[in-house]
Amino acid sequence: MTENIITETRPSIYGLTRDQLIEWAIENGEKKFRATQVWDWLYRKRVQSFEEMSNLSAAFIDKLNEHFILNPLEQVVVQESADGTVKYLFMLPDQMMIETVLMRQSYGLSVCVTTQVGCNMGCTFCASGILKKERDVTAGEIVSQIMLVQKYFDERGLDERVSHVVVMGIGEPFDNYEHLMNFLRVINDDNGLAIGARHITVSTCGFMPAKIKEFAHENLQINLAISLHAPNNELRTSLMRITRNAPLEKLFEAIDYYTETTNRRVTYEYIMLSGENDSPEIAQQLADLIKPRNKLSYVNLIPYNPVAEHIKYERSTKDNTAKFYDVLKKNGINCVVRQEHGTDIDAACGQLRSKQIKKNKAKLA
């Protein structure tokens, strides 16, 4: 006999922008200011139920409950690192799981959110792609990741708030574009969480260069990061199969369009893999690729977090990383070696989720 899993069909109200919430309220016979009150309860007072919205009528609260849920996520696992990094595993209403990471930075609290359940991009070094994409994460489910992290501080009476967001968790954000854009507009709204656009970064592997061009016209000051990891097509294809359909020539044509349109800097993420992409010769190739664009470029060299399923890859040595960095600096490239977070927990993106799913399967076996 199999257990019936009841799946919640109501969407999370967190998935609506303020304008969408106002439109919904008016369509349901309410005044515009009622939607503004709901928005205030959600993001300024950060209530945990519609019933706590004390200046709304019982009839309106019933209507909200009929159409929406508030928080669709359930906390399953929390891992805390000695450096203050916290990794969360959340369960979605359909029993699927996603990861979220809180990082304490010198400039504030940064949260890394997940946009897809699994990933189909097929990067050969990444834990996220071990389990293929099941579905997109909705805008409400992405916002809920921020709200649950913020709840941790609110419940403890701590005067701290999430100040920065990086969309670099499991999945490819531009493969979930509509929900991504709603999420960004919700958290950036000055009347809500008010997370500054320049404090938000979206990362893409560039699998669809046209999406980078589309992003250039969204009229947001949000930062763009490119998961690059190699300066030539042959090497990049061996690491990231999406390069077959989106070679560097197409990718950089879109990036150049983006920078010309927005005049905003692009960050290039480059994971340092021992013996794969960390030689001085490859560093020079990277410098040659970035140099014509250096005014609006920044290279982020990232120490690799080993993944059990990808045993062929090892972290580049500190010496090789330093030599690579020196080549870039000698060529005038703006670059940094990224500070590590959560090295004493399941630090690699997707690692905690993969472990939990294996554990659940073992229990059922």
UniProtKB/Swiss-Prot annotation:
Catalytic activity line of the entry: adenosine(2503) in 23S rRNA + 2 reduced [2Fe-2S]-[ferredoxin] + 2 S-adenosyl-L-methionine = 2-methyladenosine(2503) in 23S rRNA + 5'-deoxyadenosine + L-methionine + 2 oxidized [2Fe-2S]-[ferredoxin] + S-adenosyl-L-homocysteine; adenosine(37) in tRNA + 2 reduced [2Fe-2S]-[ferredoxin] + 2 S-adenosyl-L-methionine = 2-methyladenosine(37) in tRNA + 5'-deoxyadenosine + L-methionine + 2 oxidized [2Fe-2S]-[ferredoxin] + S-adenosyl-L-homocysteine
Free-text cofactor note: Binds 1 [4Fe-4S] cluster. The cluster is coordinated with 3 cysteines and an exchangeable S-adenosyl-L-methionine.
UniProt entry keywords in alphabetical sequence: 4Fe-4S, Cytoplasm, Disulfide bond, Iron, Iron-sulfur, Metal-binding, Methyltransferase, rRNA processing, S-adenosyl-L-methionine, Transferase, tRNA processing
One of the record's GO molecular function terms: tRNA binding
SUPFAM superfamilies: Radical SAM enzymes
Locations listed in the record: Cytoplasm
Signal peptide range: none
Residues annotated to bind S-adenosyl-L-methionine: 171-172, 203, 227-229, 305
Classification via NCBIfam families: rRNA_mod_RlmN (TIGR00048)
Protein name: Probable dual-specificity RNA methyltransferase RlmN
UniProt organism field: Lactococcus lactis subsp. lactis (strain IL1403) (Streptococcus lactis)
Gene behind this protein: rlmN
